[in-house]
């Protein structure tokens, strides 16, 4: 399997950023690591083994983004506005700088077609879902596993314009029925899953809230509630019960 590590300068973040690429050609998949994770975690958690049938056959290329969660969502105790402004800068790094990089590499491989799939576990799932729902014009698939989709766990009762714009439960709930994104959501595919085992309680509750919003608004997202034997650590590590379910989820997209 071809693996590349690429470093480039981000004007949005005023620093060098790195990302890793697995494969060449096919559908671009943008992976986000767990809370405080790094761009090399996809390989470190042995996820290429699960994705290898698609990567090796040229059906997809996985791009692994870096995070700044420890300066944003996970920087508990720091000023809330500072935290969410940092996240918003990272968001613009993804959509304004990394997405064009992905397009450039896909064009070099002769396989660029509009639309990128987002994928992540835990906090990576939150990023995957948020980017998909905020920019369905850029991202046409989403696979989110065991994530939080509102602000309560990280910001409590604090909510400003940027927190609102990064919580799908909030902004989807208030999206007008005639918003052009509605047609995009309903012509694309998104899969959000959560376990019902140990350490999934808060994540399960947040997933149900998003499920309720999507049902009420007529947004076609598939929600799956995996078994009571599926705990958070298994999903994040992608071993044990999580591994076959992950492969099954990929096939649905």
Task: Give residue ranges: language-model regions.
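Non-catalytic cap/lid and distal C-terminal segments of serine-dependent acyl enzymes
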Residues: 1-253
């Amino acid at each position: 399997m071809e693996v590349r590590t690429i470093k480039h300068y981000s004007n949005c973040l005023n620093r060098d950023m790195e990302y890793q690429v697995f494969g060449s050609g096919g559908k671009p998949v943008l992976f986000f690591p767990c809370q405080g994770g790094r761009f090399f975690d996809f390989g470190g958690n042995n996820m290429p083994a699960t994705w290898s049938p698609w990567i090796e056959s040229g059906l997809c290329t996985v791009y692994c983004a870096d995070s700044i969660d420890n300066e944003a969502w996970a920087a508990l105790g720091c000023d809330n506005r500072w935290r969410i402004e940092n996240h918003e800068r990272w968001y613009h790094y993804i959509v304004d700088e990394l997405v064009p990089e992905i397009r450039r590499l896909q064009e070099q491989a002769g396989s660029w077609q509009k639309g990128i799939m987002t994928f992540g576990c835990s906090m990576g799932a939150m990023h995957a879902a948020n980017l998909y729902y905020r920019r369905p014009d850029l991202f046409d698939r989403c696979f989110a596993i065991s994530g939080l989709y509102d602000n309560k766990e990280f910001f409590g009762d604090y909510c400003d314009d940027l927190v609102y714009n990064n919580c799908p439960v909030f902004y989807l709930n208030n999206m007008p029925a005639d918003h052009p994104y509605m047609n995009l959501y309903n012509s694309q595919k998104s899969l959000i899953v959560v376990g019902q085992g140990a350490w999934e309680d808060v994540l399960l509750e947040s997933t149900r809230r998003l499920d309720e919003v999507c049902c009420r608004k007529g947004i076609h997202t598939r929600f799956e509630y995996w078994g009571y034997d599926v705990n958070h650590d298994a999903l994040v590590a992608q071993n044990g019960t999580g591994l076959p379910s992950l492969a099954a989820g990929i096939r649905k997209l």
